[in-house]
Amino acid sequence: MPRKIEEIKDFLLTARRKDAKSVKIKKNKDNVKFKVRCSRYLYTLVITDKEKAEKLKQSLPPGLAVKDLK
């Protein structure tokens, strides 16, 4: 089941949860999508600023499996 997250802080809290398994990063020409897989939902955060996306990628939890798609 998909869920959309609007705030970066909420996304980081979700990524730090115990049931968060992996993060997929999808890059398009106009935005970057961060998708975190938890046990029940797939949470998606859409960022249009490339610099913010790089900062967020650096601040993801170290134990989480990160996969870059395109």
Curated annotation (Swiss-Prot):
Gene Ontology molecular-function annotations: structural constituent of ribosome
GO biological-process terms attached to the record: 90S preribosome assembly; axial mesoderm development; cytoplasmic translation; middle ear morphogenesis; ossification; regulation of translation; sensory perception of sound; skeletal system development
Gene3D superfamilies referenced in this protein's UniProt entry, alphabetically: 3.30.720.90
Gene name of this polypeptide: Rpl38
Main location: cytoplasm
A single cellular component GO annotation: cytosol
Record's protein name: Large ribosomal subunit protein eL38
N6-acetyllysine PTM sites in chain numbering: K9, K67
Cross-link for Glycyl lysine isopeptide (Lys-Gly) (interchain with G-Cter in SUMO2), residue positions: K4, K9
Function: Component of the large ribosomal subunit. The ribosome is a large ribonucleoprotein complex responsible for the synthesis of proteins in the cell.
Family membership noted in the UniProt record: Belongs to the eukaryotic ribosomal protein eL38 family.
InterPro entries documented for this protein: Ribosomal_eL38, Ribosomal_eL38_sf
Statement: the UniProt record of this protein carries the keyword Calcium: no
Organism encoding this protein: Mus musculus (Mouse)
Subunit structure, interactors included: Component of the large ribosomal subunit.
Presence of the UniProt keyword tRNA-binding in the record: no
The entry's keywords: Acetylation, Cytoplasm, Isopeptide bond, Ribonucleoprotein, Ribosomal protein, Ubl conjugation
Cell location: Cytoplasm
Pfam families: Ribosomal_L38e
